């Protein structure tokens, strides 16, 4: 049996630490803590309305995916990994990750409510699995590889890394290009926070596979999972570009295809197996962001003294009154 699944019936407390490397991962993740209300999207509303309709349609598809994807990740953590894994330090990491995924899900809901005032259109985005066949297909693929009956723990961890890495990465890239256009500062800030978190989640899955598994999946199985994820991303990107009538400022469909293959080869390296695609990074100017090296934002600078949320809905309206005593 895998070490991660063996319960120590004599251990009731986290201290003394028995797995210091896993504990360090947890503490790093803890240091990234933020909340969905810490980003100001007021300027984004004007930028969004000024954006050409095809470009808006592209980003709506991305939001529709993200709203669904984080909920699936939360479900897997709560119903599978956190019930099965017995190493406390790993459970601490996954507990923190689940909390972060809740923040991400709330953040995407705030983005939709802020940018899209029409309630019917909001509902279409919130119902991504029902309204978008490719999102439903991606969700089914994730659930397939997270099934503990059909897949080993190692296969599920590889699938989890593919979700947190491959399925999310092109969407992070597309949003980050808005920063180069000097628009949508709130959306970009959310993107930087979330992509940094997800990079940590993906890396931790790779760490567990390399350092804790007795039965690491064969390379051909790892490649199968990763290639399936890439094919799904290709299909989603094609769908989103069709909605955008084939044109989005900053990048082409082919560039995103190439980038996700470049990223997947890096994931292969993290999983200690051979690369698959052997392609160059089509976006060398954004390497720092892609490698999840975005600096930790100073929240004392980010938070206004009195935060004003721009969502025109009482259920989503927040005001934070912050002063030095809060810290």
From Swiss-Prot:
Ranges that cross the membrane: none
Stimuli inducing this protein: Expressed in the early phase of the viral replicative cycle.
Record GO biological process: deoxyribonucleotide biosynthetic process; DNA replication; viral DNA genome replication
Bound cofactor: record note: Binds 2 iron ions per subunit.
Cofactor dependence: Fe cation
Enzyme class: oxidoreductase
Matches recorded under CDD domains: RNRR2
Binding residue positions for Fe cation 1: 70, 101, 104
UniProt-listed InterPro entries: Ferritin-like_SF, RNR-like, RNR_small, RNR_small_AS, RNR_small_fam
Intrachain S-S bonds: none
Keywords assigned by UniProt, alphabetized: Deoxyribonucleotide synthesis, DNA replication, Early protein, Iron, Metal-binding, Oxidoreductase, Viral DNA replication
Keyword Iron appears in the UniProt entry: yes
Molecular function per GO: metal ion binding; ribonucleoside-diphosphate reductase activity, thioredoxin disulfide as acceptor
Annotated catalytic residues: 108
Binding site for Fe cation 2: 101, 164, 198, 201
Reaction catalyzed: a 2'-deoxyribonucleoside 5'-diphosphate + [thioredoxin]-disulfide + H2O = a ribonucleoside 5'-diphosphate + [thioredoxin]-dithiol
EC number of this enzyme: 1.17.4.1
Keyword hit for Transport: no
Domain of life, per lineage: Viruses
UniProt-listed Pfam families: Ribonuc_red_sm
Function: Ribonucleoside-diphosphate reductase holoenzyme provides the precursors necessary for viral DNA synthesis. Allows virus growth in non-dividing cells. Catalyzes the biosynthesis of deoxyribonucleotides from the corresponding ribonucleotides.
Protein family per UniProt: Belongs to the ribonucleoside diphosphate reductase small chain family.
Subunit structure: Heterotetramer composed of a homodimer of the large subunit (R1) and a homodimer of the small subunit (R2). Larger multisubunit protein complex are also active, composed of (R1)n(R2)n.
UniProt name for this protein: Ribonucleoside-diphosphate reductase small chain
Organism for this UniProt entry: African swine fever virus (isolate Pig/Kenya/KEN-50/1950)
